[in-house]
Amino acid sequence: PSTSAPAGVLNAVQNIMMRDRMGYTDAFGIPRLRQRIARHYHEQYGVDVSPDNVMVTTGSSGAFILSFLASFDVGDRVALTSPSYPAYRNILAALGIEVIDIPVDIEINFQPNVEVLSRAIETAEGKVDGLVIASPSNPTGTMLGPSELSDIVTYCHDQDIRLISDEIYHGITYERPAQTARAYGREMIVISSFSKYFS
């Protein structure tokens, strides 16, 4: 994340700027870019994604704001692991959405599982409308394994909980490749980021 943009990207931007080819793009992003992102999901994860289901935003923070606005109403309740990325909580609070904490610790690799998730939701006493997961996690760097991720996707589907999967750190893994939640279902929002993945 602290490196500069690749030379090829800088050169392409310079060429576009010099040719004065600036202007508005499609609201969901440049079609060729959306097609390439869909192809990336097929090449990297073996998952077929339609370019129609790809939206390009100005950074992942913009994606989180738009995803939360599209998925939740004022007064809805969204579960987050504790610890988790502080901006989730701040954005949700600004939108009038209640945060339900899911305590996680080293014993469960600082990641939720269905048992912990069920217990947190029961303790919350009432409907939980959403869940945000991050694998790899910020701040802990831990990842969900394929079976854990699959179980969470199934649980959210069965409980009618909107799942948002933060996958912006997929380009920074060490022991094993990260899995996308999209491999286990279609009814979620997956957020990724160029600045982390391709840095």
Regions found by a protein language model. Give the residues of each.
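Hydrophobic residues in well-ordered beta-strands that form the structural core
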Residues: 80, 101, 163-165, 190-192
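N-terminal small-domain helix-loop-helix segment of the aminotransferase-like
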Residues: 1-59, 66
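Conserved active-site segment immediately N-terminal to the catalytic lysine
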Residues: 176-198
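A short helix-loop-beta submotif of the ANL/AMP-binding
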Residues: 94-100
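A short helix->loop->beta-strand "cap" motif at the edges of active sites that frequently abuts
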Residues: 76, 97, 158-162, 186
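Conserved PLP-anchoring active-site segment centered on the Schiff-base-forming lysine
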Residues: 70-92
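Active-site phosphate-binding strand-loop segment of PLP-dependent enzymes
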Residues: 104-175
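Short acidic capping loops at alpha-helix termini that bridge into adjacent secondary structure
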Residues: 48-54, 74-77, 186-187
